[in-house]
């Protein structure tokens, strides 16, 4: 019985059979072919043990690369399931633009987005009260996924920052949140620039289409460098309607906006307090 068990883990003499094992291990771990081959030889063909070997090596590589400079990447839009859960923009970095465009990097961005949204929902938005602590917590929760990504990409990858959208306290009833992402590689909510907006619904129980909210987010992305009162600017794509008029016609009031372009400081607009 012991002989049969060991035989199951022996490296196949047939090269074709061995390469099938390598192919399977690479599919499961996304590690380089050379690493998969070496791990299988080291463990006599034991697939589970080979995965453990790759995991340890990936962790070691991640530690070595952990201090390397990360100057490229993408920003990610994270919107909770309810306005009370909040919204934020996460910046995720790599060492090169080539790695940031990699499918695995983009997939980890989506995983980070999903994880932060879960945390926002579970804490009713409280996790965003301290952005620096939120980065640490999110990095800890995503530690294994980040280690694997570093091993696959051969570069450092990290969550750099979280910028929360903060609605104006005096315009916070019946809130709706809109999001717009620019410069995406066909991955939802992951791009070069993200715009978030908080809007207050004037008429209760009226359904506001998602594309209306997205349009407001797009406006602030397109005009993020503009100076002056945002309410008096022409709404993006319109030559006759100002932002204030466009929102009023749709039963909305502006509360706040947040635009984050990768590598730049966030641009924030907040509704002014009414004159007393």
Curated annotation (Swiss-Prot):
The answer to whether the entry has keyword Mitochondrion is yes
Q: Which CDD domains match?
A: UBA_EF-Ts
One GO cellular component term of this record is:
mitochondrion
Which GO terms fall under biological process for this protein?
Answer: mitochondrial translational elongation
Q: Which GO terms describe its molecular function?
A: translation elongation factor activity
Annotated keywords: Elongation factor, Mitochondrion, Protein biosynthesis
> Pfam families annotated for this entry?
EF_TS
| Organism domain of life | Eukaryota
Compartment(s) of residence: Mitochondrion
Give the family from UniProt: Belongs to the EF-Ts family.
Q: Which HAMAP family match?
A: EF_Ts
| Xref: PANTHER family | ELONGATION FACTOR TS (PTHR11741), ELONGATION FACTOR TS, MITOCHONDRIAL (PTHR11741:SF0)
Q: What else is known?
A: This protein may be expected to contain an N-terminal transit peptide but none has been predicted.
Function statement: Associates with the EF-Tu.GDP complex and induces the exchange of GDP to GTP. It remains bound to the aminoacyl-tRNA.EF-Tu.GTP complex up to the GTP hydrolysis stage on the ribosome.
The name under which this protein is listed is: Elongation factor Ts, mitochondrial
Protein's organism? Leishmania major
